[in-house]
């Protein structure tokens, strides 16, 4: 069970809604993933249409929506987008994203911290997408963010946990949930994140661009479950030395 602010989730896998070939495929994949929290870019939704092709299926699926501010380049733009999302969707939950460079899509730490503090004051449950910077994550926690979402690698890159060393520090010092966001390309990456102590992962591109998104979503569901179970089982310590699993000399003594 995962708790963030005032909500609890059975699944430790969060999913996105971008890059799917169709709205139906998106919904089918989300259902196969078992995800209960789904991010939604406000710039992709036509709020003037009561039956928006993306929003309506998600509402019918019964998932918790996490609108994001993707596309915002400054704190001011992100705050404005957040206010629109709250008014339109009736939710105070928000994934804060501020990335001014469209080529790399790396989060702006200064603008993110600035916006996070203000949005918390305005009553939002803020989950900020941020770099894998332990100092920044602690500062975001201190201004009242309900969780932190450090990247594993650049958005959509499928590179995996390139920031592993920093993620381990963030997880060790955090007192709020840590959600590894961005860069997760295959199910084994998700397993590794959960094994190291992350509370959840957010996956979009790896599922959406797969030849079979529904099958890949199911694979990620199983991978996340495996990671959670492995962590709960408490793995043995690593060692540079070998450790025999069977007696090395007993049979010689019997023969003698």
Swiss-Prot record:
Top-level division of the source organism's lineage: Bacteria
One GO-annotated biological process of the protein: thiamine diphosphate biosynthetic process
Keywords tagged on the record: Cytoplasm, Schiff base, Thiamine biosynthesis, Transferase
Subcellular localization: Cytoplasm
GO molecular function: thiazole synthase activity
Alphabetized CDD domains for the sequence: ThiG (cd04728)
Originating organism: Salmonella arizonae (strain ATCC BAA-731 / CDC346-86 / RSK2980)
Binding partners and assembly: Homotetramer. Forms heterodimers with either ThiH or ThiS.
Active site: 95 (schiff-base intermediate with dxp)
Record's GO cellular component terms: cytoplasm
Protein name: Thiazole synthase
Family: Belongs to the ThiG family.
Gene: thiG
